[in-house]
Amino acid sequence: MAEGGGSVQRLRRQLESNSFQAEQYVKLLSQQSDGDRDLQEHRQRIQSLADETAQSLKRNVYQNYRQFIETAKEISYLEGEMYQLSHILTEQKSIMESVTQALLYTDRSEAARELQTAFPKEAEEGKVRNLTTLLEKVEGCKNLLETPGRYLVYNGDLTEFDVDNMALIQKVHAFLMNDCLLIATSVPNRRGIYKYNALHNLDDLAVVNVKENPPMKDMFKILMFPESRIFQAENAKIKKEWLEILEQTKKNKALNEKQKQEETTPQLPVVPEIPANPFIDEDGTFDEVEVDLTIDWIQELPEDLDVCIAQRNFEGAVDLLDKLNSYLEDKPLTHPVKELKSKVDERVRQLTDVLVFELSPDRSLRGGPKATRRAVSQLVRLGQSTKACELFLKNQAAAVQTAIRQLRIEGATLLYIHKLCNVFFTSLLETAKEFEMDFAENHGCYSAFIVWSRLALKMFVDAFSKQVFDSKESLSTVAECVKVAKEHCKQLSEIGLDLTFILHTLLVKDIKAALQSYKDIVIEATKHRNSEEMWRRMNLMTPEVLGKLREEMRNCGINNFDQYTGDDCWVNISYTIVAFTKQTMAFLEEALKLYFPELHMVLLECLMEIILVAIQHVDYSLRCEQESEKKAFIRQNASFLYENVLVVVEKRFEEGVGKPAKQLQELRNSSRLVRVNPESTTSVV
């Protein structure tokens, strides 16, 4: 024994060696072995070592399983927090970049205006000189300099793409002048030299931002009826500069043309001043009432809003907006008020975008419905109730879907269904309560919640059906699972939400299929027993077995079974009829757990088909049997079937459904009239 243990240890060390080579080991083993017996012994040693290793591995897994689960949970939580932190940092970075770019652009614009004011002639000459220098590098555009007052505003390299299929067309260089946009293409083998491509008047074009769709990003579209062109900038910063400068240049051109038109308009003769009407109030209704916007908090309002948005102080930002709206509520809409409102509206758009991002499903979903309350409440205060409702429900749909996907399918189906129902209906209940709290004053949003609840319930039923019906579970398991789902669904009625009818509608197809499938199994089993029918009494051998059968019959609802039992553990009923009774009543009990009105006719038809198989078999046997003794025994079985089994089926069906089944009564009453050809050797089913 010690020698065997030592050989196993040597074998273990040999296999654990870093220099172990399987092919060399097998070759050497086959050379050294004396025969088949040595190889069998060596195989046993390897097998015992493998079993020992497997047991050791299993013990280690069990010992560290709890620690592994806890570690996995911590990693999952940490991943969610890091993901949320990454989004916050990205958002902060974009806000800081936008603020920096706005400040730089403002500084550059002010410096340029100051320089132009101080040296107007030199500035004009400098612009023309720059335009001349650049256009000397473009072939075919000498006539552009003939237009007086034209100067260069901005220029840079762009990449043009096809509008239809986003295919790369060419590299271009764009020159933006104060009244037009010149597009030039690169000349091959001549660095820095361009060729004229197109010239667009600023009045005839419109600039449109193109939504980011990686890898196609940093793009903008220029519309020139009836065509359009798409260009890509080197980065987001340059794209933003192009969009802003193009829009500003178009505005400046329109403003200059308007000023020139006003200057050329002849002056109207001066109308002598009409004496004041002494009956009009001296204050006059013709003077514009001035609104005091010099208050410190109003002057600092745009900057304060920027700070609140950057610091994610959404409540503070909305409080400032409410304060401003209250102050301006009874004030006239003067020009300074319009300017202030335009500045504030831009901040409102930024705040709305941030709140919308907070409610996006990409955010961490671990907080549940309450985690969205802050963003939802502020969107509602901003008058965005519809958008808040839509985003809240999308967020919760993603959260519910994620929770369902994270459920592990292990163990019995019923255990999984308990977990699934608990997760889904608890989430639905919490969502409903949070929705009622967030949108208490917005009754128009409730219809959206009902629609969302139906879609969420369909998602639940898909997961439920996949596990319960697609896996071909027994009817008893199906009944228990459906019962659990119904009980959880009824809990929603405490908040006035009854989805039971929708649950029935979504499940009715699968339950019908399950009932018909199990009905076929019962019929097939009954036919198989009928084919082996010998019409003999049952001898149960021991009183214990007989007592067990009596208990089973009482559970089936047959209370007078004792009159069919004899001495010495004999039962005066055929095994086929007894088995049919137990199987039919078991089917009926499980089917009644699944019952709802839409299944009434399906259940009734299934029962009638099952009963008809037994009735026709008894009727056929009674007519074909020649021995008087067996014939009397068959009549006794027929009496038990008609007067006990069918009566109990009718009674139990009426108790479970709430109304009698006339079809079952008619079947029992008319079954004695069934006639079968005595010369036939097969049952009519």
Swiss-Prot record:
Residues 254-263 have a biased composition (Basic and acidic residues). Gene3D superfamilies: Exo84p, C-terminal helical domain, Exo84p, N-terminal helical domain, Pleckstrin-homology domain (PH domain)/Phosphotyrosine-binding domain (PTB). GO terms for cellular component: exocyst; growth cone; perinuclear region of cytoplasm. One of its GO terms (biological process) is Golgi to plasma membrane transport. Residues 254-273 are annotated as: Disordered. The keyword Transmembrane does not apply. Component of the exocyst complex involved in the docking of exocytic vesicles with fusion sites on the plasma membrane. Belongs to the EXO84 family. The exocyst complex is composed of exoc1, exoc2, exoc3, exoc4, exoc5, exoc6, exoc7 and exoc8. This is Exocyst complex component 8.
